[in-house]
Swiss-Prot record:
Gly residues biased stretches: 205-217
Source organism of this protein record: Oryza sativa subsp. indica
Domain of life where this protein originates: Eukaryota
Reported modifications of this chain: Two-component system major event consists of a His-to-Asp phosphorelay between a sensor histidine kinase (HK) and a response regulator (RR). In plants, the His-to-Asp phosphorelay involves an additional intermediate named Histidine-containing phosphotransfer protein (HPt). This multistep phosphorelay consists of a His-Asp-His-Asp sequential transfer of a phosphate group between first a His and an Asp of the HK protein, followed by the transfer to a conserved His of the HPt protein and finally the transfer to an Asp in the receiver domain of the RR protein.
Gene name linked to the record: RR33
Domain Response regulatory: 14-139
Keyword check for Phosphoprotein: yes
Protein family (similarity comment): Belongs to the ARR family. Type-B subfamily.
Protein name stated in the entry: Two-component response regulator ORR33
Lineage: Eukaryota, Viridiplantae, Streptophyta, Embryophyta, Tracheophyta
Recorded GO CC terms: nucleus
Region (Disordered): 193-220
PANTHER family: TWO-COMPONENT RESPONSE REGULATOR, TWO-COMPONENT RESPONSE REGULATOR ARR14
Known function: Functions as a response regulator involved in His-to-Asp phosphorelay signal transduction system. Phosphorylation of the Asp residue in the receiver domain activates the ability of the protein to promote the transcription of target genes. May directly activate some type-A response regulators in response to cytokinins.
Record GO biological process: cytokinin-activated signaling pathway; phosphorelay signal transduction system
Amino acid sequence: MDQARISFFPDGLRVMIIDDDAKAVRRATATLSQLQYAVVATHSTASAGLRALSGDNVVEIQAILCDVHKVVSSGFDFRRVVESELRIPVIYLLSKMEEEDMVAGEDAEFLNHLLLTATYIVRKPLNPTVMARLWRVVAWRMYCLEERIQANVAANAGAGGEDDDDDDDVVIVEEPQVHFKVVRRTSGGSRKRQLTINVVDDGNRGSGSGGGGGGGADANPTRILQHITSNLQEFRTKHQKKDMAIERPLISSDSMFLKAILPTLKISPCNPLILTGGIGSSSVAAEAFAGGSSSAAPLQIPVFQQQSTGNGNTVISFSNNASPMAMRAPTDNTMISFNNVSAAPVANAVISFSNISRSAAMQAPAARGQHLSGDVQQLDFPQQKLYFGPFSYQGPPPPSMHNHINLLPPTSSPVTCSMDKGKVPIIELPYGMPVDDFLVGQTAYGGAGLSIGATDAAATAYPYTDAPSNNVATGCLMVPRMGPAFSITEPTVVAQGEGIGTGVDAGTSEKNAIVEAPNNPAPLMVLDQVAADAAMDVEEDIMFSLESLLGPDYDLLPMEDVSAPDTAAAGDAAGGSLDGEEGGMDIGWDLDLDDILVENVNDFAFLDNLAGSE
């Protein structure tokens, strides 16, 4: 044990005693001397001991034994001040208190605080066995104080040198080229901290804060400002590029509508709207007309190739693969052929644009093995899905459209519905509607017209107005009927007149002309049913009998001609009668229509019967 104590305190443990009881001080000094603890100073108050420790003639002291009641009377925490500032452990001495020595109020609270935060407490009188282990307590506390002080210095340096006790302290961290200094303004309402970073060379560290430190302080903020400015400029550049990518306006090549209508427009290759250097291989048909060369030529328009023949015809071929294809152009007309192996085939799908006034249908060449001019052989290729319009949703056509589709000749004025004697009407519809959308009750120009809400087997008119034909927006697509002609039931038409005894059919000539129409009508015709409906719509004075309106399921009461004489006399006076002279129907009851209630069960209930039942 002595060897361990000597290793920590080779000159012995040097102790200061603070107590106003002289007898207790002498007794404590004798006990400590036996344990080889040297008592170097004694003081009666804590303030006197603190002044002695802070003076110039201070002696080396390694531990302080202080009566806790003297600390209470001093009014400050003696242990905290000495241990934090002088790094000397303080051990409190606690004596048995008499009634007159008891404290109360704030002193009692302060005493409890001192005892709770004390490093070590020893009761008086001193026990030699307890005091023999005192050197261990002192050695451990000295080590803790050294470590705590170093930790506090490092923490203050990391936080920028902030010190709670003194605002004007300067903490210098021994690191190369960096000095931290905190300046706090006490004048004014708000206190602001100013951090200055001084860059000092190793060669000028001992020369003071003269010219070297000032020059570094002046140059460093400029460097920091340049660094921040460059980062901000890079940040702005990145965001500007991102905004430009998001807000990039659509160019002409991005529009699917332009890509679809460019083949139908006569634009020179130098037009900026047309993309040069198209993708894929060139059209084999164009190569064949050019001389049969198999070398790939650059495309002026990426979706089609256009070539004029010697006879004034134009062939426009669409091709998405490299297989050879050539179409023979009909005489004095223009043919558009499609070639895409991924599309569904359509039998004999030909779109013809007539540049002349005739309305004859264009037919595809029947022979598949014929040779064109320049020894170009026409080859078979998969039939193509046909689109009506520039957008993909306007196709494919329904089964009733698997026929030749022709364009009408130009008309001088928009006609909603026109019909000649013995011919079916021609209906003109607006362009831009999908194929599967049918108009009901409205025509191309907003007026009431024919009903086109029929099924595939019924009449259907597909809009294709505004098609380019000599720069005139004309034409509509019509489908011939696919089934037998229909006829409507002959209506009973009754008109007032003299000498007429039976009903007259106003639409007999039109109906007969429709029924006698051939089974294979010419193009640009609709079904007979639609024509008959159109003929009936133009009539204004059409009347039906009550039996035709009610139908055969109604059970009418037996009619009695009880008022025939009166009705005949009234008819002679008025110039005619519907029941007497014209042979019309007779009403067998004298009740008004307001006296009859028509129920959902198709029965007639009279008001008199209802009143009697009630």
